[in-house]
Amino acid sequence: MAQREGIVLSTEKKGLMRNQKIETRNKNEASEKQRAHWGGVFAMTLCVFALIASEFMPVSLLTPMAHSLNVTEGMAGQGIAISGAFAVMTSLFISRLAGTLDRKILLLGLTSMMALSGAVIAMAPNYLIYMAGRALIGIVVGGFWSMSAATAMRLVPVHRVPLALAIFNSGNALATVVAAPLGSWLGAVIGWRGAFFCLLPVAILAFIWQLLSLPSMPVTRQPAGAGNVFTLFRRRVVTLGMLGVGIFFMGQFTLFTYIRPFLEAVTKVDASAVTLILLVIGMAGFIGTTLIGRVLKRGFYPTLMAIPVLMAIVALALIAFGSQAAIVTALLGLWGLISTAAPVGWWAWVPRTFPQNAEAGGGLMVAMVQLSIALGSTVGGMLFDHHGYRSTFLAGAAMLIIATVLIFLTSRADASAGDHS
């Protein structure tokens, strides 16, 4: 009898525990649904689109901007360099400077600064004011991207974070497709200042959407200082990898920043043809972004090494066939296909290399990429102004080959480490 009662009690206890587990699971599911702010994710994606378009708009408008501001094309290209420099500083120190400020307020402030930057650039009476406007967009780039992963983690459940980040990146991919050709077309129709003014309503819409859809994101404690980021370099795979990604993006933007002057002066195409070629680059880049994930699964480091090798070959081929429009268009289509896909691969490298510290690794990646963009556009501008396009393209190709070697060494260091920490 006692044994039977014990069995009954045990059965009741198991049933109670099962019910509690079901209730807990239901509460967790309900909590996850409550924490999913997809409207905020899409609002930030619109902000990404406007941000990328703002950052690289000068590439498609370099010639008319240089003429209007009475500077060389190389000097006009320094607008990309200064935005990269300010993005580096911001990405490293924004967490400490923002302190416990609600991250929603911080994101809204950055979006407002993006709109202000567009207005300052569009109305810039001289080169100095233009550069000040470019510095503002650099602050926004560094602040926004360094917080993107952490913000995604607060907007959606943990298992949905990769999807949220992929949606963010779709704004990036869309901007690469339409921003350059649209900027070139708008520049021909309403002038380069009008093209920058067109970014204002997009930034304002992104601000309003974020204001309505983002939840409050308070910070209860002061984030770790920027100094902790640099301790990541103690690992050989990090040092080599960051050098590889840095030289890669430096080589890319040494060449690509000055593609419009090359098309006009060497290939001898008009503004409408420039717009078409930039559209080809963007569309190819969108395709590359959608395909790169599958390719990376087949061979991660071999893919990262193949990208700069192919880009270096394209750079050399552009020198050889620069006067033939059809070949140049095909070569730049290949450039867009592989170069736009490269950031996806390198962002996949971050959680692979920093599984326990992805946010710090992401901040370091933003700083390295933006610093490289700044250096690349600066070096490219100096070479373009003083030695012509051949030296610019040769320098870009050389950097891409060096990046390939560094990526190979990174893969060896990663393999010898055996695991990621």
Segments from the language model and where they lie:
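Cytoplasmic helix-loop-helix junction between adjacent transmembrane helices
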Residues: G133-G171
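Paired small-residue
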Residues: S117, L128-L136, A326-L334
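Helix-loop-helix hairpin linking two adjacent transmembrane segments in secondary transporters
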Residues: Y127-I129, V158-H159, L163-L212
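Conserved MFS/SLC helix-loop-helix module at the cytosolic interface between two early adjacent transmembrane helices
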Residues: M89-P125
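A late C-terminal transmembrane helix in Major Facilitator Superfamily
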Residues: T353-Y389, A395-G396
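Helix-to-loop junctions at the C-terminal end of transmembrane segments
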Residues: T90-D102, G288-F300, F384-D385
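Helix-breaking motifs and short loop linkers at transmembrane-helix boundaries and internal kinks
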Residues: N70, D102, M123-I129, F321-S323
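C-terminal transmembrane helical hairpin of 12-TM major facilitator-type secondary transporters
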Residues: P302-W346
